[in-house]
Amino acid sequence: MDRNYPSAGFGDPLGAGAGWSYERSAKASLVYGSSRTSHPETDILHRQAYAAPHPLQSYATNHHPAGLSGLFDTGLHHAGSAGPDASVMNLISALESRGPQPGPSASSLLSQFRSPSWQTAMHTPGPTELFISGALPGSSTFPSSSALSAYQHPASFGSRPFPVPSSLSLQDPPFSPPANGLLSPHDVLHLKPSQAPTVPSSLGFERLAGGGVLGPAGLGPAQTPPYRPGPPDPPPPPRHLPTQFNLLASSSAATAAEPSSPQLYNFSGAAPGPPPERALPRQDTVIKHYQRPASAQPPPPPPPAHSLQHYLSCGGSYPSMGHRASLACSPLGGGEPSPGAGEPSKGGPSGATAGAAGRATGPETAGGGAAGGGGGYRPIIQSPGYKTSKGGYGPATGGATRPPPPRSTATPKCQSLGGPAAAYAAGKASGAGGAGSQAYSPGQPQGLLGPQAYGQGFGGGQAQDLSKGPSYSGGPPQPPSGPPPPGLATCQSYSPDQLQGQLYGVQSEPYPGPAAHSQGLPTASPSLSYSTGHSPALSGHGGGWGPSSLGGGGEASPSHIIRPLQSPPATGRPPGVGSPGAPGKYLSSVLASAPFLAPPGASSYAAGAGGYKGKGDGSELLAGPGGSAAERTEDEEFLIQHLLQAPSPPRTSGADGLVGEDGPADAAKGLGGSGGAGGAPGTPYELAKEDPQRYHLQSVIRTSASLDEGATAALELGLGRMKDKKKGPERGGETPEGLATSVVHYGAGAKELGAFLQKSPPPPPPSAQATQPAPHGLLLEAGGPDLPMVLPPPPPQLLPSVLSHAPSPSPSAPKVGVHLLEPATRDGAPQPPPPPPPPMPLQLEAHLRGHGLEPTAPSPRLRPEESLEPPGAMQELLGALEPLPSGPGDPGVGPPNSEGKDPAGAYRSPSPQGTKAPRFVPLTSICFPDSLLQDEERSFFPTMEEMFGGGAADDYGKAGQTEDDGDPKTGAGPPPGPTAYDPYGPYCGGRASGTGPETPGLGLDHNKPPELPSTVNAEPLGLIQSGPHQSAPPPPPPPPPPPPVSEPKGGLTSPIFCSTKPKKLLKTSSFHLLRRRDPPFQTPKKLYAQEYEFEADEDKADVPADIRLNPRRLPDLVSSCRSRPALSPLGDIDFCPPNPGPDGPRRRGRKPTKAKRDGPPRPRGRPRIRPLEGPAMAGPASITTDGAKKPRGRGRGRGRKAEEMGGTRLEPLKPLKIKLSVPKAGEGLGAPSNDVISGVDHNSLDSNLTREKIEAKIKEVEEKQPEMKSGFMASFLDFLKSGKRHPPLYQAGLTPPLSPPKSVPASVPTRGLQPPPPTVPTVPHPAPSGPFGLGGALEAAESEGLGLGCPSPCKRLDEELKRNLETLPSFSSDEEDSVAKNRDLQESISSAISALDDPPLTGPKDTSTPEEPPLDTGPTASGPPPLPSLPSSNSSGTPEPPLLEEKPPPTPPPAPTPQPAPPPPPPPPPVPALPSPTPLVTPVASSPPPPPPPPPPPPALPSPPPPPPPAPTTVPPVAPPEEPPAPSPEDPEPPDARPLHLAKKQETAAVCGETDEEAGESGGEGIFRERDEFVIRAEDIPSLKLALQTGREPPPIWRVQKALLQKFTPEIKDGQRQFCATSNYLGYFGDAKNRYQRLYVKFLENVNKKDYVRVCARKPWHRPPLPVRRSGQTKGPTPVGGNSAPPSKVQAPPPKPETPEKMTSEKPPEPAPEPAVPEPPAPEKPSPPRPVEKEKEKEKEKEKEKERVTRPLRSERATSGRQMRTDRSLATGQSTTSRLPKARPSKVKAEPPPKKRKKWLKEAVGNASAGDGPGGSSSDSESSPGAPSEDERAVPGRLLKTRAMREMYRSYVEMLVSTALDPDMIQALEDTHDELYLPPMRKIDGLLNEHKKKVLKRLSLSPALQDALHTFPQLQVEQTGEGSPEEGAVRLRPAGEPYNRKTLSKLKRSVVRAQEFKVELEKSGYYTLYHSLHHYKYHTFLRCRDQTLAIEGGAEDLGQEEVVQQCMRNQPWLEQLFDSFSDLLAQAQAHSRCG
């Protein structure tokens, strides 16, 4: 590690002067540090390593780096039990001595994680601090270790890759957070702005960045792993990163290149998103770390503001860069430049970091900007990197394509990065964005230099300059000059320029606090600028600054500039360049900010940067991204969103961007909001000052944008917009809006989306609050300010500004100044307890005040806010705490703020400071949910989070929720809880999406993040707890009591917390523990890792979990986003309200929120639900949110929670589909998170608390829901357990899902059950309870499972698995229908679980696949929010995901649909089922272990997202299935495990009257039996389709048996969705017949006297049933044609057993690629099982097929061809597997597979396609030339040279080669009705026969001649001599050895030698052609035999398979054969035409 620290140099340069500067920041960091303290030893070691390094060292050393380390390390890595105290002490001392200590903190943090890298980064005291502060939480996030290490190494030890790899790899990953530093940027930003902000920044940023970058994309998963397992971290990270960062990837590339090893590694390790989650905290730390370096360089001059800023900037940048280039950055920066360079490098990393940066970009951008400012990091990092990284921006560079634009802005920075010139150019370029990105990338490496130069120039100037046109112009020059002074100079240069120029225009505001530093140009600039810069951080930075500077114009400029940067993407680069232009767009933002133009400038700027940025920048960033956002939205949406969102800072940007994207107006608003949110980071700092307004605006926009951003974005947008509108009404509202936006912003981060959504919900509440516009505004503003406050200075300003919006800015500024300190302090408070004293009080007060009071300074404005906030204040406080969760939604802040500051608090919540919270909030807001929250959580329990994965976004949502819970998470669990609750309200909304679950998740998240944030988060909690928390929280965490203490501490929030507490507390507690007790933290981390592990098979879990997180998150996010808008708000609201109701006091804070939220959110929620199909969900969702929150803690389990949460959950479920993830996440995340945290933490500490709470909750639930009796609960618990078990099984399949599945199972069942309740929304409580219960149960179960596994996750998991397996059956023991019903219920639940699990699969798979997030993103963006998410998830994921999609689509709709009606009744039945689940949940909730399970839930979350729909589906089925349990029990475990959750997707279902009656083959295996009439409830049709599309559990279908309907329940087999006959019957007479609609199904098989069918995608052909397929050749051909169709059909959805294939087939048309991806795996797996079932199935099918063989051959053919092609493409994708499945389909005959089938399957290369083609021919078409001719006629020419034909031919040749080796091959194929080779063979034979018949028409063959031609394979043609009597005649002499046409073996009997035949010369060609066609197969066989002989002769002992494979690898030979075949057919066609 130390070597990482080579950073001595790094530290030295940075550390020396800057380090100290940053110390202030460091102090903030300290808070984190305190956490880290836990690892003093480690820390110290590292630190020592550092120590030499220097100031940083000293400061690192003494600072609580240990604390940080402890926090992180301990929490994350180590179990420094002592840590907590040390942490606290450190925190305090660090806070007190903030200056020096922070460094160590960071260092410590770094040390812990990657001490070296961390420390390196941390060396710079300031940055350290920042890092610490941010990093801690953030560090966990993702860049953390890798990035940190990586870039740190690179930078500092630029070339010290070892550290990178090593540290990075191990430490860094753990340190991912630092790596996250890159995420941290935002955090950094925040941090940077103020010390206090630092933390929040960090946190926020981390969240943002981590979450955003990583978080959003892969944060959850990515982070978590890193978090948990450092190493795993990397894996996920990549995935995440890539997603998250494309930038990362890109960055990685760039960065990697840059820092190269480090960077790369970074990518791997740090970049990997996982780190973000886990590393978020680290990230923060990293940020700090990074920052520190930056700080060192530039900070020295303006340490305070700058420090932060620089820190931010550096840090941000650094993180960004730091991520990858952190080292580089830092190292580079050794001096500023280095950092700049490094940063750039880092920027590259930034890419990775970008996310960080991106977020950071908010921060980083801000940070980067700041970094840029701060060092040139910013640019590097950020923007480009960031952006790039960010996705939002990073993407620009890299993966974010879209993001790039935003990134562009970042990029510009990056570009700047590229060079100062570039910087400006970049800045300018913003368009350059791309360039920037590039620049960045290039810059990155080059950036090292350039970056620094640019960094400098760019950073400061760049961002500013660039960002701002003004400074820009000046900037460029400046930058150049700056570059010279790289770090400082640049920083200063432009800093000043910026500062002054625009930077400072805005900066001035920041001035107040940061101004000075700001002034300290570099610092100020960075700081402010940075803030702004943040904004600028890319654009915002520039823009922000520009804007800032631009002030009015500038302001706008900043905004727009940001926008330009960002905007450019969004607005257009031009704006980027052209601030003004941007401004236009941005302006609104800015404008919005305008009021706070100046402040906004600053704020805006900061905000812009953060808020601004968020707003302007953010907006821009975001907006850029906004614009970009829009673009980004889709692409970025996830990436960017993730990145962006992750980069909430950018987030802000994202939000902003989102916002921007959202719309300038929105942007304006959003921007403002975003800015606020986004700005949060900036805002907190500068933004805070004024951005709040702007921020709010941005926030709003953010929300909108967010919404926009995500697929959900739109929803969210709507939501956000709604919010906006609601909020919009008043800017104040705006603030809320901002919050909302912010919230939305989260949404924007797909990942964050969840959070986002969740956040969103908060916004809605804020909207509601908007009603309290003024207050809101104030609140929001306050929130913003709070957020900003996070950056104390700005916050105050912001707050005032926010508060006053326009009016207060001034005060704000001053306040800011004050605040800076205070907030800083506050930040510090959280971060640096010492300052906290004031801050503490402040915090307390602020927190109390709702954060509105943020700091005393802010108080005044807070006061206004306070006024609003007061209630809110409490809330705020709580909110701050809770807001943490809320924070997740900056919106939380905003909304919370709106709510009452809750949001601020919430945001703040992330904040470790009440005020800070707000500040943080913004950060959080910006990055909070994802980054922060998630990061935090991630930091804390990245694993958990990851597990929650769903979590990332969900986490975010959860984070938001968690924030509610997060409050708990916050460490001030209780307070936060409560606050969170309120914020939760808003957050709830946020939570709503992830809501219930999320809450825990959030909590967890928070907890995780709270590590740092915990400090921060806890802070909010603590804040309420306030300073104490700050101090105390850390202490509390150490002891279990502390969490409780927290609760008490939360005193005021306590109630809320109380209710939330159990879960929350766990979270909080856990969080606190983690945070406070570093060791616990570490332990938790470890635990978490373990938990995670156990949850997801440790490593696998890690990665998968990570992935899962991501997928989950994505889906969740998507869901969140999609659902979020409604759900979040609604959920939040509902959640809140219900929760409050149920939770009552506990939810108290929330309650208010709830009230507010209830109203508006619900509507919103409803819509969301509506889309998601969760009308009830809306209510329930809300409920769920609340419930989630509460249940989240234990909540899900809570019956009451169940109700509330259930509702929410339900809602989420329904909407969740995608959103499911969120709720799941919320549930899973929340509960799991909480649990995990608690599990981890909770193990020690929370366990009791949680348990008590849970028990209490259970009691409550039971009281509330008598239905949920213990027995039932127990039953359900068992069931859930079993369900979980399923997941475990599943997990086996998907490691990650394992745990998550566990949770998923719980969730799913819960969910499945839940949905009905949601349906019952009408019956809110019961229904919600049910749903919640279900969800809760699920979660609970998961929780329990996890919880149980908490201590030893793995063991637990295993036990759970076993238990589940054992219990599964008993699950319904309670139910009346014990067998049937139980089974049904189990089945439903299993299905739900399966669906959930599947998603986790998806998640894990996704996790495994970096693309997953992107995929998700795409899907998310794309159409069905749920579906896409799911599909995307699935798609990206694996077959399972697709499965999920397939199953879910139908399910969700039906579930919801049926549910509405059935649910009410079902609730009772479900009572057994649902209630049971609920009780289960409750028990689960009640049991502390559940908290651990929650971690699984997070994984589940991803799963859950899909599952929810399935759940709904399940629910309907549950309702019905409840009764019929057959299928479930049967495959619930295994089948469900894998496919349970998601089956292969199917585009649609053939419902009579609804589907086109085209004679299109329905595809898929199975036989259509006209005699079997199946129907489905009319109301279930939408659910069915949705479920099939998503792979979720569909509603049941019924077979008409005269006057009875036999129920067929859905299940998954081999990934395919099928329906199994049950013994449940309903009457079908009278009016019942009107309620059902005919459905077309294909009969698959009959096993154990049970029929299995699958729903057709299209109406099957109705061919006259041919009695039997004739084997007659003639007939055969027809059958061939006909059969072909069936095979085609089969093919389309290959064999059911091969669900994947089937899915593929079915889906291929639409999602062929997707299926292809997933399919292969599934088929492989299913393939073995398939045979048996399939054999029977095949037999049946065979008969059926025979019946239908007569179908129109032609259409069939055509279809077949078409499908074949699709299949083929799939096949290609799936390769053998695919083929296999395809062949299987050919199995349409339903014959048992041949014994060799497996081998063949493996060998089958083109079988699938071949099967496709020939699938139909029943008999050897060879012999018969008749029937198929028609069909074949159509096919030949068309298929001749198609890929399908080639594949078919390949399969044909493979079969012939096999036959050459094994003479009995063909016979065996025939006997077994092989579907792999027979279809292709028959198709080819059919073609030949068809052509032969055509040729025959031209000939008049005598029987003798024909017989001779047929008998002899050779034909000699002799022309008669001229002059001979027969001139003109030709002699045909048949020759050769007769052979058996069927087996191709020589006949043993002797044949009379053929005679000569004379034919006309003209006709001789026809004879030879006829002969060639007839014997083509044999001739080819002979060639194959020659080939095999040649191969066998050349090699020794080659097995048949090897020989076959070698032949098939001989491409030229195959081509030659195919060409000869094509020529032959072409010749035949030509001859047949002429004639």
Swiss-Prot record:
The modification Phosphothreonine is found at T735, T1295, T1555, T1699. InterPro entries: DNA_MethProtect_Complex, DUF4211. Residues 223-240, 296-305, 476-487, 830-841, 1031-1046, 1314-1329, 1449-1529, 1710-1730 have a biased composition (Pro residues). GO terms for cellular component: neuron projection; nucleus; postsynaptic density. The modification N6-acetyllysine is found at K1214. Residues 365-377, 540-555, 670-681 have a biased composition (Gly residues). Residues 490-501, 520-534, 1769-1779 have a biased composition (Polar residues). Keywords: Acetylation, DNA-binding, Nucleus, Phosphoprotein, Synapse, Synaptosome. The keyword Nucleus applies. Residues 1200-1214, 1535-1547, 1698-1709, 1731-1768 have a biased composition (Basic and acidic residues). Its main location: nucleus. Residues 210-280, 292-311, 329-584, 645-685, 755-844, 851-870, 879-920, 946-1061, 1112-1244, 1288-1355, 1367-1567, 1662-1839 are annotated as: Disordered. Residues 1190-1199 have a biased composition (Basic residues). This is Proline-rich protein 12. The lineage of its organism: Eukaryota, Metazoa, Chordata, Craniata, Vertebrata.
